[in-house]
Amino acid sequence: RGLGDVYKRQPVKKEKRVVFMGNSITEGWVRTHPDFFKTNGYIGRGISGQTSYQFLLRFREDVINLSPALVVINAGTNDVAENTGAYNEDYTFGNIVSMAELAKANKIKVILTSVLPAAEFPWRREIKDAPQKIQSLNARIEAYAKANKIPFVNYYQPMVVGENKALNPQYTKDGVHPTGEGYDIMEALIKQAIEKAL
């Protein structure tokens, strides 16, 4: 994580640092569109394959210790895919709430985002009810955000397609991870929300 050292220094007064907390969708974003992060001074903290449990474990190091003005949290895809064990919506939702509360306790603003659509996971095809689980988790994240006056960015709506609630093939090659075109959609939404929040 050589690049991470650049951010170990504390932000200068006028700099409003923004950290993106996530999984391979965030990691791939930084790789696919590095300029979106560089130009805006955004810091990507996406680690491929991780679930919300693992996010919570590194939240202090990867978010709080960087003293950002704001954190964008995108969690849930790998939980539903059962990457670290059986999926429990209450636990995943609880981890997202814990991250939001940790941020707030450290005077870091929060933007919560929806889980992206996925009809299935190429590495876990036996999970047949991913769309229902994703919709249910998204509804809870959105309701929590609303109740706590936290901005919520809905990536799901503009990217979902068809009765099987898939990630639109225009925006993905594998049904889970966005392509450059998919990230374009996300960038327009998140940039607006960040500017409004700061």
Question: Could you describe each region identified by the protein language model?
Answer:
Residues 2-7:
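Short, small-residue-biased leader/transition segments that mark boundaries at the very start
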Residues 11-13, 36:
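Short, flexible hinge/linker loops that cap or flank conserved catalytic cores
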